[in-house]
């Protein structure tokens, strides 16, 4: 299909066919259709979460060693990229930390311990379906009873992975609203929301869903809140590491100077989120937040990545008009066939275009936080590798069983 697209659209022969094939795959595969969307935050919390099983998951709630018990934080979306770092930071700061997960057995399996062990040490893991409002409230009431009604904060790191309308409103709006309403039901004091910088210019479904929840959070009066809108995560701008290590070019859009960003590390962002529980200057505020770097273009990011791997830069410039051709084509098919799958594919194309043309950048010194630079991150992952996430970028490469065994052995 990618070869046909190349010839029919008269695309340059040098354009990576994987780029075209991935976009076309959006319309045909439930899994690959999500692979194009850049990660915006939080972890996978599907709208088809497992049913909640109330088998006294709180038996060891007061047995964690990660806090004095005087301060309590409940983390939703705990297994996500930012969520797991937030759990660790909450424990580090002395909170009795409750990590809400959809599948406790999976988290506590051997594989789960490899993924989450260092992040969840000292935290209490509680299985819960955040999409089930009644069960979520029941869960938080049980937690509250175990800590004498002393829940300082509910921290939501929830985010849909795909960004399509159905998922966005199920997670970015409704599941997050469930967390708010459950927090209000148990008189939790503060709500910290991991939102997204890009909602400032909302022309995507997930942005509108996030804004709808932000409005609900601001309208209620029972809990104080802090809305944190990070620019971009390090993971979101690291997806081409493996392909350039293998000799493929770094792909960018336009001339590589179209957009600028100052991404923030997961550890720095987690620190900011947990600090927001007790920092009264952030009460009832919306905070745009970026990392310590100066504005970085996509070309500059590529140069930094090549520096980290010790190779000469090799760039491929993808034309921005390609997005319009693909989006318009998919939308035409969606409208003609009344196809939800093609509608979702068109939305994913719009998400890709958004991040190719919009700055994710804070310039006010008060909106910069953290110590880790993107170059330091690139230098680190060039040596140690990075956790595979197919949702980060179309260029991510799935690990083989052999490579995973080698990583564990190392």
What are these regions (language model features)?
Residues 151, 176, 240, 298, ...:
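A general structural signal for well-ordered alpha-helical segments in protein cores
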Residues 54-56, 321-410:
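A hydrophobic C-terminal alpha-helical subdomain
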Residues 137, 177-180, 266-274, 371-379:
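Short, amphipathic alpha-helical "lid/cap" segments that border enzyme active or binding sites
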Residues 142-157, 161-191, 208-215:
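NAD(P)-cofactor binding segment of oxidoreductase domains
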Residues 52-118, 131-134, 141, 149, ...:
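Oxidoreductase cofactor-interface core, primarily capturing Rossmann-like NAD(P)-dependent enzymes
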Residues 76, 157, 194:
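Residues lining the SAM
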Residues 128:
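Cofactor-binding loops of NAD(P)H-dependent oxidoreductases
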């Amino acid at each position: 299909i990618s070869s046909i697209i190349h010839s029919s659209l008269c695309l340059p022969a040098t354009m990576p066919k994987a780029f075209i094939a991935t976009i076309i795959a959006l319309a045909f595969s439930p899994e690959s259709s999500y692979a194009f969307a850049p990660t915006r935050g939080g972890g996978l919390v599907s709208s088809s979460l497992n049913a909640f099983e109330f088998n006294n998951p709180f038996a060891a709630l007061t047995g964690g060693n990660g806090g004095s018990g005087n301060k309590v934080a409940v983390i939703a979306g705990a297994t996500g990229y930012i969520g797991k770092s937030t759990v660790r930071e909450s424990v580090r700061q002395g909170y009795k930390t409750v990590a809400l997960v959809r599948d406790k057995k999976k988290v506590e399996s051997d594989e789960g311990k490899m993924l989450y062990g260092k992040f969840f040490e000292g935290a209490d893991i509680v299985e819960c379906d955040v999409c089930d409002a009644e069960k979520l409230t029941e869960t938080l009431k049980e937690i509250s009873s175990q800590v004498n009604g002393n829940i300082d904060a509910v921290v939501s790191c929830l985010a849909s992975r795909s960004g399509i309308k159905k998922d966005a409103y199920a997670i970015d709006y409704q599941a997050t609203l469930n967390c708010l309403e459950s927090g209000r039901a148990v008189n939790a004091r503060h709500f910290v929301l991991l939102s997204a910088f890009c909602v400032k210019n909302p022309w995507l479904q997930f942005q509108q869903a996030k804004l709808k929840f932000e409005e609900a959070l601001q309208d209620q009066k029972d809990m104080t809140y802090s809305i944190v809108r990070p620019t971009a995560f390090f993971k979101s701008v690291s997806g081409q590491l493996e392909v350039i290590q293998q000799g493929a070019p770094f792909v960018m859009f336009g001339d590589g100077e179209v957009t600028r960003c100052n991404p923030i590390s997961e550890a720095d962002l987690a620190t900011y989120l947990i600090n927001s529980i007790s920092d009264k200057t952030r009460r009832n505020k919306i905070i745009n937040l970026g990392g310590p770097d100066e504005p970085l273009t996509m070309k500059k990011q590529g140069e930094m990545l090549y520096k980290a791997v010790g190779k000469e830069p090799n760039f491929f410039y993808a034309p921005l008009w390609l997005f319009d051709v693909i989006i318009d084509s998919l939308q035409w098919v969606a409208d003609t066939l009344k196809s939800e799958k093609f509608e979702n594919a068109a939305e994913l194309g719009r998400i890709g275009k958004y991040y190719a043309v919009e700055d994710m950048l804070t310039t006010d010194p008060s909106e910069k936080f953290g110590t880790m630079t993107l170059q330091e991150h690139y230098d680190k992952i060039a040596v140690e590798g990075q956790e595979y996430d197919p949702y980060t970028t179309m260029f991510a490469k799935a690990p083989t069983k052999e490579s995973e065994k080698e990583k564990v052995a190392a």
